[in-house]
Amino acid sequence: MNAIRWLGELLEETHWSFVVAVVVIYGINQGFGYALAKVGTDYYMKDVQKLQPSESQVYLQIARIPWVIKPIWGLFTDIVPFFGYHRRPYFILAGIVGILSMLFLSLHEKLHIGLALLSLMAGNAGGAIADVTVDACIAHQSVTHRSLAPHMQSLCSMSSSIGALIGYSLSGVFLHLIGPKGVYGLLSIPYALMLLVGILLDEQRALTDYTQVPKKFWDAIMRMLTTLIRQDVWGQCFYMFISFALSLNIHEGLFKWETDSKAGPSFSQGTKN
């Protein structure tokens, strides 16, 4: 009952479309969708594209570039509105890009790795754009409803955790039933819900002078650079970069062994009886 009362308070104080947006983006797309995509992409690279672990690792890191440049998407959502809206058009754009990229991967036979990589990058771009957009919505709601800010973060974490738990629990089942390409087709559903969020989201339309957009964009970049050159900021960023860059990641090699028909336990679509 406390959980229901807590959720009801969020719905009453903010807006139901905001809560739906958080659940869709954090729970269904990033939680469930990421878990399903992670397992499906591993098998897609090995069983469909027939790539070696070293090749797969490189391609997957390239495909994640849209997530690396998330600050750029954030600048666009804050500074460049469409038809007076800063959030709704970006949810719609992210949904359309994600749907098309997932269906392209799902429906094409013998897709060239270059086209597959572009499709994966497009899908990640859709996810990254939606992520920064919903974060902007949360930041706005946290300012207007300061007492509910911790509860909003709890909603984000809870949605993501539950979605990921369900996604990883069912990913093997879906992979067995419909294969890696079928999984990509299934992943178009979270992006369709993302598109629906863009249509339904409650957002006030604002008057915008588009002639000021370049100046605002440049000012935002300069403020960002001013922040980054502070020692207490760039030092922490440099430490995090080095810690990630020097950390060995043997996931693709381990996955190759796990799915090998001779040396490993053969957990593979390509070798199942």
Annotate each PLM feature:
Residues M1-W16, A206-C237:
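Juxtamembrane intracellular "pre-TM" segments in multi-pass secondary transporters
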Residues I28, S101-A130:
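Hydrophobic core of transmembrane alpha-helices in multi-pass small-molecule transporters
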Residues V39-E55, I250-K272:
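Short amphipathic helix-loop junctions that connect adjacent transmembrane helices
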Residues L75-F82, L105-L107, A164-G185:
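Transmembrane alpha-helix termini and helix-breaking/packing motifs in multi-pass membrane transporters
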Residues L93-M102, G182-L200:
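Symmetry-related core transmembrane helices of the 12-TM Major Facilitator Superfamily/SLC fold
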Residues Q57-V80:
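Central cavity-lining transmembrane alpha-helices of secondary-active solute carriers
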Residues A63-K70, L148-L175:
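Glycine-rich segments within core transmembrane alpha-helices of 12-TM secondary carriers
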